[in-house]
């Protein structure tokens, strides 16, 4: 790998610090895929996960497509995604591609789960380090390098106002948006920066608490709530909810739940 690519940790998003309307930012879909840094050197392409683990063999068709880019060397950042029957990015459907290790398993996963590499940044090209350039300039160069709607595509974005994109994500039950400062350089991780901020869609629904299960360690007294929902008048089990419960909430639940017990019959 090149000096820049060696041990590279991709730029990471902060979890707060941006608004949906900001003339200094552009807005992209928050993808439900897997982060991949791709390096092209001559006719060779190397793909790496965010943690540096090699991914070239897992997505060989993407590597082949990148090898055809009309430039001797380039370093790109993006996400590999697959789509469900409704055309939405699906991490669950992508999982077999991520976890397959043996050559036969990789081939089977490739045949059953087609993927696309959606590129949103260009870190280097033609022997030139581009990380110090403003994001909008890097994207301008990227759009000239990657064209069309094949296996490798540029992720679209909207400038100044991300509210319509956010509303679309919420309506379609997508992950949310990423708000990026137009003039920001590419800041190599692992430190998170408010130059890029995730704005996740909040989702809510009504459920009936059916009971709870014990946890482990500090959460031994209450690990998760068991919840259900009414479907055509019938109460159906929907699963467990445990994340997001603070210690204070758990204490309150343990105090109140016994008084709500009912006999099943």
PLM regions and their residue ranges:
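Catalytic cores of nucleic-acid ligases and guanylyltransferases
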Residues: 1-265
């Amino acid at each position: 790998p090149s000096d820049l690519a060696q041990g590279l940790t991709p730029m990471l998003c902060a979890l707060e610090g941006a608004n949906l309307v900001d003339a200094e930012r552009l807005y992209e879909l928050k993808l439900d895929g897997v982060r991949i840094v791709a390096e092209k050197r001559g006719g060779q392409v190397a793909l790496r996960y965010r943690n540096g683990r090699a991914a070239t063999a897992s997505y060989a068709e993407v590597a082949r497509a990148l090898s055809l880019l009309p430039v001797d060397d380039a370093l790109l950042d993006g996400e590999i995604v697959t789509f469900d029957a409704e055309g939405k990015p699906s991490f669950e459907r992508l999982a077999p591609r991520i976890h397959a290790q043996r050559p036969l398993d990789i081939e089977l996963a490739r045949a059953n789960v087609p993927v696309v590499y959606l590129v949103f940044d260009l870190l280097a090209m033609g022997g030139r380090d581009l990380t110090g350039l403003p994001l909008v300039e890097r994207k301008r160069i990227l759009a000239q390098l990657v064209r069309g709607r094949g296996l490798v595509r540029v992720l679209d974005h909207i400038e100044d106002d991300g509210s319509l994109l956010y509303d679309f994500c919420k309506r379609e039950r997508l992950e949310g948006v990423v708000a990026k400062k137009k003039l920001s350089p590419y800041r190599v991780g692992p430190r998170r920066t408010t130059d890029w901020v995730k704005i996740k869609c909040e989702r809510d629904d009504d459920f009936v608490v059916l009971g709870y299960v014990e946890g482990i360690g500090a959460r031994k007294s209450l690990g998760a709530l068991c919840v259900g929902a009414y479907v055509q008048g019938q109460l159906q089990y929907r699963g467990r909810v445990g994340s997001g419960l603070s210690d204070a909430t758990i204490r309150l639940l343990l105090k109140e739940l016994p008084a709500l017990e009912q006999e099943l019959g």
